[in-house]
């Protein structure tokens, strides 16, 4: 387990990342293991609102699962950024760009991590699920699969039409304003909803898994997205319980 703290040029600040690396097995030769030049699959694991990069380390068995499966797990700090580019703050905080334009090259360059699409997976919880869907639908060429726990792409047109009666209106209104207005939002990476159909038509799209609890506040949005995804033919697993 490695904890990194470094200056990010995309975020304009120091940032934290936790990285779980595969462990040498009992009885293996250390020299042979560390010089093997083997490349390992990577899981990009994104935390939720009010969380941080070590949430999964503290509250799950992710290190055990990663070790059992010879998997590198990368857990970046995203603060409460919604995995968006915040250009109207000083200095700018470009979280969306950070993962693909800075952190991925760092991990691929410094660690025995495979950069092949079939070896890269992304997963997130809540805000992290929104982030995972942003990356997977904007960069489907980078990921073999995407898992979203308690979070799905938002139908921004419906939310804006419903206004304050929609529980997600206040949050999405800020995102729309940050993008420069509704038209700019609809033409940006933030508009994941409209990218779903494009990905659904790919010959070899990423695999998708969406799960949500039936008592979760996100559940109505989750059902709305499920109906839309099934209508346009997105190949995905939807799990509710």
What are these regions (language model features)?
Residues 1-241:
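Non-catalytic cap/lid and distal C-terminal segments of serine-dependent acyl enzymes
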